Amino acid sequence: MRTRLSGGVAGEAGRPVPLCRFFAKYTDCVIVLIMGVVGAGKTTVGRLLAGQLGWEFVDADSFHSAANVEKIRLGIPLDDADRAPWLKAIREAINRWIAKKQNVVLACSALKRIYREALDVGVDVKLVYLKGTYEIIYQRLGLRQGHFATEKLLVSQFAILEEPEGGVVVDVRQTPEDIVEEIRRLLGLKPD
């Protein structure tokens, strides 16, 4: 096996494999990444799931810089350059959780495939996509209080959304309790 300086090992066809994926068979933890556009219910479902399992809940919004938070508050869509340090910080946190064998439910938009690749979704990170139409999510946002989401932000997120090819897909028209039950069933998750 050939070691690579980039932090991975050589995999199939000589492509680098991130160390976390290489060592995943030795880990005893699960990171559940709940993705979707703003208003899909990531935080509500994530907190409920984490509470039922006795796991930690983390909202990826907490990894944003103050400048990003201000842009979001003003309704200015973030670009890939804005998101790069945010994704790096999240991946570093995931690596720490894996090293500590800590089960975590992470709410993160992860709208593009390249973002999910940066987070190394796969072996150690289980993806759950909260899927809903623009109309359903827009209606939900109108009912929310105390959140910085705007219609402009929702439009921009749907514009860049690349639906995942793998993972668990859950319809957001269900109650949060039903969504959590479906996630637990599909991923075989039991409390610690």
Name the predicted role of every residue range.
Residues 34:
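Hydrophobic anchor at the beta1->P-loop junction of P-loop NTPases
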Residues 38:
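The conserved Walker
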Residues 42:
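Conserved lysine of the Walker
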Residues 47-90:
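Conserved substrate/cofactor phosphate-moiety recognition/catalytic segment
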Residues 100-104, 126:
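Loop/turn-to-beta-strand initiation segments
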Residues 122-140:
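Conserved phosphate-donor/acceptor-positioning beta-strand/loop module used by diverse small-molecule
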Residues 143-182:
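Small-molecule kinase domains that catalyze NTP-dependent phosphoryl transfer to phosphate-bearing small molecules
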